[in-house]
A protein has these predicted regions:
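Extended, subdomain-level signal for the structured scaffold at the beginning of enzyme domains
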Residues: 1-99, 106-111, 117, 128-142, ...
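Short amphipathic alpha-helical segments and their helix-coil junctions
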Residues: 6, 147-148
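Anionic-ligand binding patches
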Residues: 120
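Short, acidic/turn-prone active-site loops that include or flank metal/cofactor-
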Residues: 124-127, 145
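A short glycine-threonine-serine/GTX helix/turn-capping micro-motif
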Residues: 149-156
Length: 203
């Protein structure tokens, strides 16, 4: 069986760990996952931490993926007003077998119409802002991550790694998930409802 293709949607100002936490885990399992990066154009994309990434494909040239992942970051406040980006994301998301997000990436999914009728979560610090998007999204405040059919969304930043472990387990079982977490020496949460940050931010 060929590895599942995982496409990471990049934009200037994305949150670094939103991307490279999951990429670390996927990358430890090359027989199961093949990761590529997407960008608006040919130029490198700069994270909010100043690290630049060269993408494999432009948005326009991206093939249909098995899994797409949309990160968050402070720049989502600007990106979410880009109607051309949202239109592209809407079309791209419909070609993916699984649509996932980390942090405020779920706001982008919601604004693109990709979470209508789904349960979802997001970064708790920004939750009140995020939940203004998507008319029929059921936003879940007390969740480390939420799986709803072909949509997976996580809470803020590091929570993306917990979601990724759960996704790997769902696709390939406990042994493969344990292989990745063992190599990464990752102490992760297995209960998606354990989220201390919801209470911390008054949710």
């Amino acid at each position: 069986m060929a590895p599942r293709s995982v496409q990471i949607v990049l934009f200037d100002g994305f949150e670094l760990l939103d991307v490279f936490g999951p990429v670390e885990l996927f990358g430890l399992l090359p027989e199961h996952f093949a990761v590529t990066f997407l960008a608006p154009g040919e130029a490198p994309v700069r994270s909010s931490q100043g690290v630049t990434v060269n993408a494999d494909h432009t948005y326009a040239a991206a093939p249909a993926p098995d899994i797409t992942l949309v990160p968050g970051g402070l720049a989502t406040r600007e990106v979410i007003t880009d109607e051309a980006f949202l239109a592209w994301l809407r079309g791209h998301g419909t070609t993916a077998r699984l649509v996932t997000s980390v942090c405020t990436g779920s706001a982008l999914l919601a604004a693109a119409g990709l979470l209508e009728g789904y349960r979802a979560t997001s970064n708790k610090y920004a939750f009140r802002w995020v939940e203004t998007f998507g008319s029929t999204v059921e936003w879940v405040p007390h969740a480390r991550w939420v799986e709803d059919r072909d949509r997976w969304t996580s809470s803020g930043v590091a929570a993306g790694m917990d979601m990724t472990v759960a996704l790997i387990r769902a696709l390939y079982g406990d042994d493969v998930a344990a292989e990745a977490t063992g190599m990464a020496e990752l102490d992760y949460r297995t209960d998606s409802t354990q989220d201390p940050f919801a209470a911390l931010h008054g949710l």
